[in-house]
Every structure is written in structure tokens, then in C-alpha cells.
Amino acid sequence: MSPDRRRRDLVLIDLDGTLIDSVDGIHAACARMSESVGIEPPSLEFVHRSIGRGADVLVGKILAGGRESESRDARHQKARAAFDQAYLECWQDGTRVRQGVFETLEALVSEGREAIIATNKPGRAADEIVRHLGLDRFVSGLA
């Protein structure tokens, strides 16, 4: 089957790593979370390698010393709550819109396309980030 090459009017765009670089804010939240549960904070490099599959997976890997972990016990729940609170407080630490994003979004809008941001960030943090960075003027929602 050949791909359908018709123009699409709806564009779904990933937030982290595509529209924004947020690793510094995530790292800051991981450090605060680690302190709250009494473990060594992860390095920036570890966080950079470990993000992308959601906060539950990231928190689990930190608690398990870098290994994949499916555990969602009370310790994990406490750490996840600490991470979520810390991220709301420090997501701005180094979070920035990537080069060329505003121009690309403006071009999509001027072509009559609708853009929606896809993210696995918690809703409150995602809403705040999109609004604060000015991405909300180009998109019709988050998924």
C-alpha cells in the first residue's frame, strides 16, 4: 500500500524535545524529589537518557538505581508526588522553546492547519508550560 500524500489539516506535534528543551527543569525536579526521599540525585546525563516515557518510568528508574522498574509501591507513589510538586515549582529552570519553533508554527497556522501538542507531561504542568512559553497562541489543544 502506498502512503496517502494528501495534505493534512491537523498536525500533532510532540512537546518535549521537539517544541521545547525541558531537560534542565526535569533534572531540577528529579534532584528535589531525590532529596525528599533520601537518595542520591541523578546526574543530568542520566535524566537526559531516561526521559521520554513519562514521569512514572523516570521516577522508577531513579529509585531503582538506573534499572527499569515496574514497582509502583508506596515509596514510588511518594517519590512521584514529590516529583510532580517539584516540577510545578522548577520546570522553568532552563526550559526553552527550540530554535525555529515559532516560525514553523506560524507557517502551519498561515497555511490553515490546526496544531495540537502531544505530551505525556501531567496536564497542569503541560498547560502552564505551553501558556508561559507562548505556544498556546498557535495550538488548539493538548493531547
Model-derived features: where do they sit?
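Active-site neighborhood of HAD-like aspartate-dependent phosphohydrolases
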Residues: 2-49
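Metal-dependent phosphoesterase signature
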Residues: 62-103
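A short, structured active-site edge motif that brings together acidic residues
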Residues: 45-46, 50, 77, 135-143
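Helix-loop "lid/cap" segments that line or gate small-molecule binding pockets
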Residues: 33-34, 54-71, 129
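Hydrophobic "anchor" residues on beta-strands that sit immediately upstream
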Residues: 10-12, 116, 141
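Short alpha-helical
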Residues: 25-28, 54-57, 103, 124-125
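Conserved H-loop
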Residues: 40, 69, 111, 135-140
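Short, acidic loop-to-helix structural element flanking the phosphoryl-transfer center
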Residues: 6-7, 88-117, 123-127, 131
